[in-house]
Regions:
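ATP-dependent carboxylate/phosphate-activation module, predominantly the ATP-grasp catalytic core
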Residues: 66-143, 173-202
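Conserved active-site beta-strand-loop modules that form the wall/rim of enzyme catalytic pockets
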Residues: 64, 76-79, 157-158, 165-170
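Peripheral (often C-terminal) accessory segments that flank ATP-dependent C-N-forming ligase machineries
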Residues: 156, 162, 181, 187-223
Length: 223
């Protein structure tokens, strides 16, 4: 039963590795949109049959780019290097149009696609930082319990923050996040503050490997 706004997650039928996501707020809307997307070839029946339906959290989306160091003897083992957000096509183009214009578009243009085409850097208000670290620490602990030796180095928690300032994690990247490339030249805002110099994710990985080699502890950071 669909009794609130949801997002239906499945693969795009024609674009490899891209999304065929769509939103709906009722079973009737689910049926109408899925049939329209099937007709236009955006999705296929096999993917629709295995689609995942999640509650859609209304709020801004932030990717939290963390780094976990098992080598750290002093200070914090978990670092928040930076935050980014996404540009999605054709969704971002749709939201710049007045609602009446969206309603008069041809059927094949009315349902936006959510293909990530870029990223930009962001910050979050200070009162939300403590909770962000709590999420990162919980993820590290869970990864150790279920996938020994757990997460090492960079990882990304993809979150949404609602109107009551609650975080919702809708996906994770147990690796270098795609949005970190916006910080290659100038570093991450939070990483720069921690290390007092431009600190991109790539530089932080290089530092960790150098420290591990100098301490003869490479096996602790490599799997």
């Amino acid at each position: 039963d669909i009794d609130c706004l949801v997002i239906v997650k499945l693969h795009h039928a024609q674009k490899k590795l891209e999304r065929g996501f769509f939103t709906c707020a009722s079973y009737k809307e689910y049926t109408e949109k899925s049939q329209a997307l099937l007709k236009t070839g955006v999705i296929d029946q096999a993917s629709l049959d295995g689609a995942r339906i999640e509650k859609y959290v209304i709020g801004p989306v932030f990717n939290l780019n963390f780094f976990y160091s098992p080598l750290s003897e002093e200070g914090e083992k978990l670092e928040l290097l930076g935050v980014d957000w996404r540009f999605e096509s054709s969704l971002d183009g749709h939201v710049r149009l007045p609602a009446p214009q969206q309603m008069t578009m041809p059927l094949h243009q009315q349902i936006p696609e959510m293909t990530v085409v870029g990223h930009n850097t962001a910050t979050i208000r200070e009162s939300l930082l403590e909770k962000a670290f709590e999420l990162g620490e919980k993820f590290i602990q869970a990864s150790k319990e279920h996938y020994d030796p757990g997460i090492i180095g960079p990882f990304c928690l993809q979150t949404c923050i609602d109107k009551d300032m609650n975080y919702y994690i809708y996906d994770v990247a147990p690796r270098l996040g795609g949005g970190t490339n916006v910080h290659v030249n100038v570093g991450h805002p939070y990483g720069n503050a921690t290390w007092r110099k431009p600190m991109s994710s790539g530089r932080r990985i290089a530092m960790e490997l150098r420290m591990a080699a100098e301490q003869d502890r490479l096996l602790e950071v490599l799997t």
